[in-house]
Amino acid sequence: MKNRLILLDGNSLFNRAYFALPPLMNKDGFYTNAIYGFAMMLNNILENYEPTHMAIAFDLKAPTFRHKSYEDYKATRKGMSDELRMQVEPLKKMVDAYGITRVEFEGYEADDIIGTLSKLAENDGFEVMIVTGDKDALQLASQSTAVYITKKGITELERYTDAEVIEKYELTPLEFIDLKALMGDKSDNIKGVAGIGEKTGIKLIKEFKSVEGIYEHIDEIKGSLRTKLENDRESAFLSKKLATIVRDMPLEADMDELLVKSTDYERLSEMFREFEFTTLLNKLKKEQLGKEQPGKEQPGKDQQEPGREKQSADIERADIIYEYDRQWLDSVESADIIINMQAEKGEESNCPDIEKLYIKNANNIYVIDAENIDDAKAILENPSNRIIGHGLKNIYKALKKCGIRIANIFFDIEIAEYLIDSNNTNFTLEYLNNKYGLENFESLEEIIGKGKKELKLIFADKERLSAYFINSLYSIEGCYQMMGPEIEKQELSFVFNEIEMKLVRVLSDMEQEGFLVDTALLRRLSLQYEKEIAELESSIYSLAGEPFNINSPKQLGVILFDKLALPVIKKTKTGYSTNIEVLEALQGKHEIIEHIMEYRQITKLKSTYIDGLLGITNDKTGRIHTTFNQTIASTGRLSSSDPNLQNIPVRTERGRALREVFISKEGYLLIDSDYSQIELRILAHLANDEIMLDSFRKYEDIHTRTASEVFNVPLDEVTSELRSAAKAVNFGIVYGISDFGLSNNLGISKNEAKKYIETYLDKYVNIKAFLSDVVTEVERTGYSTTIFGRRRYIPELKAKNMMVRNFGKRLAMNTPIQGTAADIIKIAMIKVYEYLEESGADAKLILQVHDELILEAAQEQAESLKLKIKEIMEGVAELLVDLRVDIKTGKNWLETK
């Protein structure tokens, strides 16, 4: 095999890793995301490109020759954050443990080291591969040297040889230096020539070949472009000097010194344990034992073309069975079954949402067309088979339409990742595959495109598509094998198995059932609001003295502040602010303000809710089928989208009336069950606060009691104003509100708000102690937990910025309360669902909103179901104070309130 040297730009790549991954910390509060991402990159490179020689170049703190030539070189760069700086030395030690040579040289940058080593290696007949996040390295590309630029994430790379640089940029690699000399580089504070960008720069280089060539022919260049070049002649030549990577450093390097050495498994394992890199540690153990990783190529497979990445689609990983023995398939039991589906069959099919179903067990992969979907029934409906996938809610729902109900929804890697890393917002299979160090394969986005150019699956290349779904099974399996132990390690088994995985089927059925809407009423409301909007427009034009675009903040600002001379409350970069806070501050100053506020309220209701709901009501069912999102809120709360039914306005009379359009079908009633003050009850339990516990046990109005305690007045003398203030403080404490936030909510001074909070905490001493203890514990562990064990990692508590740290404190205090409430409502949903299923009751769960569940039940069963549902929901958790559920029935949602 030809010698292959891989050179890595250490600084570029660990910066890339730091910003590509969410903040990660170990139990000691030590940040690890840059180290983790860098390790992922190293694993990917070592596995997929098999170097014989390797070196990682790092910058030193000392100034380089470029700083001596130009003292403002890189002067605009912000200093390295403490969170990143603390990871540099451990990262270098990790590189040493991998057996990879580190190279640093005072007075030069990592780029120069790479440039010099690559030239030496080329002269010795090596094939060279450079990996960096900096396009400056493209000047080093040649027939023997390929430059790999990080594309997105931490493992996806884009390859450039000299031919590929020319093809993409129409410039040779060396001409890239001249382009940077003209354009400059903000990140390095290289000035270039003011006013020349990439397009003009490329045009000049193509014509004159270099900076020197441009100035030799400056007389041929006309107009303002010539003026720009003449004004910045000195800067152009200096910029070229700064942009040129040195390839003849006084670096005495023997290629044998760069040989990839044996990994120090003991040292690396110790580091991974310290950093709590469970997945990398498991992978390292398998490598050490000589075990094959999921998705790794089979022995005997031909080596890939040197310097090219292995293509998983070409790997024969298992027997892929298109014509299979159904009898054998039916006999599979007590097995881990990995599944994925290719969607988009079409409305007319008996199986409308599935084109193909992909199933993998230990040895084989089965590809089942929609027409033969019944062949999968036995294996999926056998409760002894553990079904594992990514996004199982949608797969379960699609299969249910085909007459198949998965019996054992065992492990969803998307949900597992949501629990393992509560701050992660990316749960795509591609991201998880990269994060857990599995073999890269062509992504779905690469096959079908995205945005306006995105293809429907049925028009995509069939072979590439099939390869993607087959590879996805290995990816899901690999993630599952690594996530399972991590779930146990973080003590998340109850939350994962008993709450989140059981909830998948519940949410899927709720989405499929949908909520019936009165479309006739929606249309009447649309016409009514249209008329009211027209009347308001007329009134506003009359008061303004002229017609204008009311929806234009700029035009509205001119009317209010220039023409009507109202006091300016706030300005933005583009002019006057006319947001709701400004309008509220102007109330009473002019009659037009109330009209504008009402106009905005009605137009929002009409466009977003009235017309919006009409547009997404299913023509066949007459129902709205929202999507419940299980992996969005870090607290564990569910959210809904398309449409967001949790955001139906309730503060205004018109908003509340909107609930009237949500109805039950003929012969049925809606049952609305709502936990009463659940978060305050949880707070009373967690803090073991006698005043609050006593109030709940006596069935007192908790806000009146709080007002009595905080404002030192008898219960019977608490006014509505005092009760409102106490309510704001109660819920402010739950949500970790600041004195600034409370002052805004109550319209009082910041000092008054601060005094309210201090008085509250002086009275409720156990709550004060609880909140303080929670913050201390989170500072120690890095995460906050619910009663049931759900974790939320709070790296903000380690931040340098005081505002960010204070925000972290509020998150730490709020998470046990709000997160526990989220767990309780989810458990309640599961228990109610299971009761309805086991009892055969003619009722279905159709909506969850915050602490509220809505069912649609047969009219004759509604009263008995009310009692049973109340009993179930109030018995979900044993707290020091009873949970209480308010429950009502009605023909529409408004009637249940």
Region locations from a protein language model:
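Conserved RNase H-like, two-metal-ion catalytic cores of nucleic-acid enzymes
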Residues: 6, 10, 16-53, 71-72, ...
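Noncatalytic, basic helical substrate-engagement surface that gates or grips nucleic-acid strands
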Residues: 1-131, 135-159, 235-238, 244-252
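Conserved catalytic core of nucleic-acid polymerases
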Residues: 455-458, 505, 512, 618, ...
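C-terminal polymerase-core module
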Residues: 534-538, 542-594, 762-810, 814-816, ...
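Active-site-proximal helix-loop-helix substrate-binding element of RNase H-like nuclease domains
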Residues: 155-156, 162-180, 315-316, 350-488, ...
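Function-dense linear segments that define catalytic or interfacial modules
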Residues: 358-363, 420-446, 450, 468, ...
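Non-catalytic nucleic-acid-binding/docking modules located in mid-to-C-terminal regions
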Residues: 2, 51-55, 100, 123, ...
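Conserved "right-hand" nucleotidyltransferase catalytic core of DNA-directed polymerases
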Residues: 232-371, 454-650, 669, 679, ...
